[in-house]
């Protein structure tokens, strides 16, 4: 009888050990808020930034535009029409006039008075709140933008995406020490070409294109993987897919909801 109990005990311990080995810690990706926490506050406003910081979102994606008098602003569209009470291209406006615009009322009455966010103010608040910034560069003033980022001591806390090859080359010349250059990769077969031509640090890939082989190939080329899971509709399945694939960053329009379900990024 004792021998039987002993054998059963050993079997139970072995099974428990196997179970522990199978349940490896799940890697939670860094959450990147597309245009800020844009489902609970107007996109690219300070209210949206503050919501990211409040809920522990690790990264905020933004587009940087430039005014007529060379002041940098955070705005997704090139025009002011959709998200402010102004009209026309932001590049045709002086900063003093841009600063008077309402960038919150379109979203909800309680956000009336939110302003078009100056990029310098975003950098300062991000620095204070421990928020990384992912910059989608448009055009104009690259050297000046980098100088502004350096003046805020935020260069190591920014990721950069460029759409033009000449901008990428210029960026590498101006900031060779930065290791957070992002590049879009549309398919697994495109990895070698992008690595050869752009030499990025982070692969930006739509979630529909990702699979284990894609991720593994990126890793072999020394790339981190950012999964694009954009849209305000239900992304439950896509979010889970990104987590299961072990991506490094997930870009989402619902960052707070992702954090509430999965928690903050695994160190």
Residue spans for each PLM region:
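Phosphate-group recognition and catalysis centered on beta-loop-alpha active-site segments
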Residues: 17-267
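Bacterial Sec-dependent N-terminal signal peptides
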Residues: 1-26
